[in-house]
């Protein structure tokens, strides 16, 4: 099976905001990865890979996914569920 590469390009909204001149507040820091610990204000946290902010909503950016989309968030939750020690990766198991 080949992995689906359909959503490989960044969303146009984030590309648009990445082209804007950077603000001099927290944006000069290196990329922090997670949005919940990033010191950037919420509207700009999508540049830091943060929460699905109101400015940079791409289709499928669900809440709690870190701005990566609902499938990525679901996968992250299922991996965390597997690492918790259960042998079944069923969505209703060990919640």
UniProtKB/Swiss-Prot annotation:
Sorted UniProt keywords: Early protein
UniProt name for this protein: Probable protein E3
């Amino acid at each position: 099976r080949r992995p689906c590469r359909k959503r490989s390009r960044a969303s146009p909204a984030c590309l648009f905001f990445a082209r804007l001149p950077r603000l001099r507040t927290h944006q000069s820091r290196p990329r922090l990865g997670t949005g919940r610990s990033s010191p950037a204000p919420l509207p700009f946290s999508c540049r830091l890979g943060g929460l699905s902010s109101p400015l940079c909503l791409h289709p499928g950016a669900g809440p709690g996914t870190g701005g990566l989309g609902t499938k990525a968030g679901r996968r992250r939750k299922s991996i965390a569920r597997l690492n918790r020690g259960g042998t079944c990766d069923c969505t209703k198991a060990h919640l």
